[in-house]
Design a protein with these regions (language model features):
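Conserved pre-ATP/AMP-binding loop-to-beta segment of ANL
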Residues: 101-110, 114-136, 143, 166-172
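Conserved AMP-binding A3 loop
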Residues: 132-156
Length: 306
């Protein structure tokens, strides 16, 4: 946090991250919060006009980018934004730095880590209503909208998951979804953080590698969104598929064609839920609820009115 402060980051400033599933993403996220600044994790597949829209909209003071993703910024304009520094992660400063960063201070992550720290007096404890993130929607009806997400809203993503899945210190959460998304970052990582559980994070989802990863990590919990659980189920079956430590898979939506057989095959309980970046996860199925297609569970009426 004090090294981000040395780059000029302070309350209300934005730190934009085009970063794969790496520990550096999580460390700089918490560092941003300790300065009262706002973290902006964006989709690592963005390029061209889609990337430019979010860069111009967020107006970050500092940009973090994986070195092998930096080419995505070629041809992109920051508009009225004033990027004072760019930090290249896992690979150092590229030979051809995109022109959008030409006036910014350019550092490798090692350079950044070696910066002289600012005075500790700049550290703050954010209030629940302070903005923690700008997370961008998928842009179904037009350009992606940046959702202003207060700390309390983000914490509730994790708390709801922790309670619904009964996460405890002994659990191990296998995270194969992107950490720029509320599901991977807030439901899975933050839910585990609240519970004091372990996390095992991989770069991306692979149905071919899924079960091997689950076994290697000794995972007890994981999430599978959209078509992911069906892709897993369509993988060739083996009599050893149930040889794993999973107890719960948070999956939505599910289908009659495979949901019950998925539970039997992998010896797990499927839980469902409903939510969006903007509104949190107001409903989950519980451990005693039947597995029903089209049912997102019961409303968390302690926190939501639906």
């Amino acid at each position: 946090a004090l090294r981000l402060a040395a780059l000029g980051v302070g309350p209300g400033d934005r730190v934009l991250a085009l970063v794969k599933n790496r520990v550096e993403l999580l460390l700089t996220m918490f560092a941003t919060f300790k300065l009262g600044a706002i973290y902006v994790p964006i989709n690592t597949e963005l390029k061209g006009a889609f990337l430019e829209h979010q860069l111009r909209n967020a107006e970050p003071k500092v940009v973090l980018v994986d070195t092998d993703l930096a080419d995505a910024f070629h041809g992109v304009d920051a508009g009225d934004g004033d990027i004072v520094a760019v930090v290249f992660i896992a690979g150092g400063i590229p030979d051809q730095v995109p022109p959008v960063f030409s006036t910014a201070r350019q550092l490798s992550y090692e350079d950044f880590s070696a910066l002289a720290a600012a005075d500790a007096g700049v550290l703050v404890t954010p209030k629940p209503e302070d903005i923690a993130f700008i997370m961008y929607t998928s842009g179904t009806t037009g350009p992606s909208k940046g959702v202003l997400m207060p700390h309390a809203h983000c914490y509730l993503f994790g708390l709801g998951t922790q309670r619904a899945l009964e996460l405890a210190e002994a659990d191990r959460y296998y995270i194969c979804m992107p950490l720029f998304h509320a599901n991977g970052l807030l439901m899975q990582f933050l839910g585990s953080f609240i519970a004091g559980a372990w996390v095992y994070v991989v770069e991306r989802f692979s149905p071919n590698r899924w079960l091997d990863d689950v076994r290697a990590s000794q995972a007890t919990v994981t999430n599978a969104l959209g078509v992911m659980p069906e892709f897993i189920f369509r993988h060739p079956e083996s009599p050893l598929d149930s040889d794993n430590n999973l107890r719960v898979v948070m999956a939505a939506p599910v289908a009659d064609e495979w949901s019950t057989d998925f539970e039997r095959r992998y010896d797990v309980s499927i839980r469902q839920g409903f939510g969006m970046t903007e509104c949190n996860i107001p409903a989950y199925t519980g451990p005693d609820d039947p597995l029903e297609v089209g049912c997102a569970g019961q409303v968390l009426d302690e926190f939501f009115e639906v």
